[in-house]
């Protein structure tokens, strides 16, 4: 069994949000003919997507070809829209979540849903989380690596974490809103360097901000193998202990204490990196994630995990399925 925690999906179409809300910055979908569309933002192409980004039947066909049993579906992070007026973001979130729920309902043995929330308005976010879990049946939510000027340790977000614990709602943290201009404007650096940096910042913020201390039952998984965090934990812990005046202001516990308190996906593209990741984060805390259907994703889902001579069959099963089931609070028999 293979359960992919990290995949993205969009509706086939959605309303003209600039006309609906009366201001720019929204992502629009421009169909280019059968099987291809452009995601447009402020008149510029953000990304060209293929039919597998919106058509569940195409996805299932490709899943069958690659041996993937289940995909956890989440929106493309540029759709988060945390910058917008909260009521407008809420309306978009409800549209995206309803579309996601309809897809899961059609194929409940192949898909599970990770919803999206208007995180810039925690009260509204909690209400939509309640709806996602209780009405739509989602086991989790995808959130960004920061919410405008809030890092993930900001007390404004604590009501969301309280609700997530109460509802047993898992959080999948995805980097977004990287610096795109200046020195980062070339070589695809926002995706190659900016995303790992965003994820590392999110992990450090939650650790040093005491989030895992305050919310010990919170289930969090970070995308892209936790960014640079597994490789730089030594530097982070050393800096914490050498400069507690800067690093221990909100939490006095060594960062290493929280290894094992959160999950990452497995998307590191390299056997040495995957070995390090499981050594640092734990073999019980790494989950197969591919970033399907995008080019930076793992093109052969689970192949790297299966190729690892250091992993026994029990470990491989944990990484490809068991850890995802634990993180999402689901039973294997639902998908067998």
Swiss-Prot record:
GO MF annotations, alphabetized: aminocarboxymuconate-semialdehyde decarboxylase activity; hydrolase activity; zinc ion binding
Positions annotated to bind substrate: 47
SUPFAM superfamilies in the cross-refs: Metallo-dependent hydrolases
One of the GO biological process terms: secondary metabolic process
Domain of life of the source: Eukaryota
Pfam family, one: Amidohydro_2
Temperature-activity profile: Optimum temperature is 40 degrees Celsius.
Tissue specificity field: Liver and kidney. Very low levels detected in brain.
Enzymatic reactions: 2-amino-3-carboxymuconate 6-semialdehyde + H(+) = 2-aminomuconate 6-semialdehyde + CO2
Enzyme class per UniProt: lyase
Sequence similarity: Belongs to the metallo-dependent hydrolases superfamily. ACMSD family.
Name of this protein: 2-amino-3-carboxymuconate-6-semialdehyde decarboxylase
Taxonomic path: Eukaryota, Metazoa, Chordata, Craniata, Vertebrata
């Amino acid at each position: 069994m293979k359960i992919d925690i990290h995949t993205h999906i969009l509706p086939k179409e959605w309303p003209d949000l600039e006309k609906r809300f009366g201001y720019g910055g929204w992502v629009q979908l421009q169909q280019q003919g059968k099987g291809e569309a452009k995601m447009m933002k402020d008149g510029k192409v953000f990304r060209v997507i293929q039919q597998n980004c919106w058509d569940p039947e195409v996805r299932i066909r490709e899943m069958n070809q690659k041996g993937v049993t289940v995909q956890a579906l989440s929106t493309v992070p540029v759709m988060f829209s945390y910058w917008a007026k909260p009521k407008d973001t809420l309306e978009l979130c409800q549209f995206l979540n309803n579309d996601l729920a309809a897809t899961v309902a059609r194929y409940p043995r192949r898909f599970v849903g990770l919803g999206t929330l208007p995180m810039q308005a925690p009260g509204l976010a909690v209400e939509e989380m309640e709806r996602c879990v209780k009405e739509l049946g989602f086991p989790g939510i995808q959130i960004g690596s920061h919410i405008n000027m809030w890092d993930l340790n900001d007390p404004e977000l604590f009501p969301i974490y309280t609700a997530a614990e109460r509802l047993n709602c898992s959080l999948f943290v995805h980097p977004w809103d990287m610096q795109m201009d200046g020195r980062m404007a070339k070589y695809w650096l926002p995706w190659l360097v900016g995303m790992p940096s965003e994820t590392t910042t999110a992990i450090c913020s939650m650790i040093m901000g005491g989030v895992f201390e305050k919310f010990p039952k919170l289930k969090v998984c970070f995308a892209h193998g936790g960014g640079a965090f597994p490789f730089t934990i030594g530097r982070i812990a050393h800096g914490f202990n050498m400069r507690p005046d800067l690093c221990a202001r909100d939490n006095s516990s060594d960062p290493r204490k929280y290894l094992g308190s959160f999950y990452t996906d497995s998307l590191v593209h390299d056997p040495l990196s995957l070995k390090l990741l499981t050594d640092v984060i734990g073999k019980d805390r790494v989950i197969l994630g591919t970033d399907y259907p995008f080019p930076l994703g793992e093109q052969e889902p689970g192949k790297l995990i299966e190729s690892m001579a250091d992993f026994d069959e029990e470990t491989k099963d944990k990484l490809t399925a068991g850890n995802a089931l634990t993180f999402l609070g689901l039973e294997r028999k639902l998908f067998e």
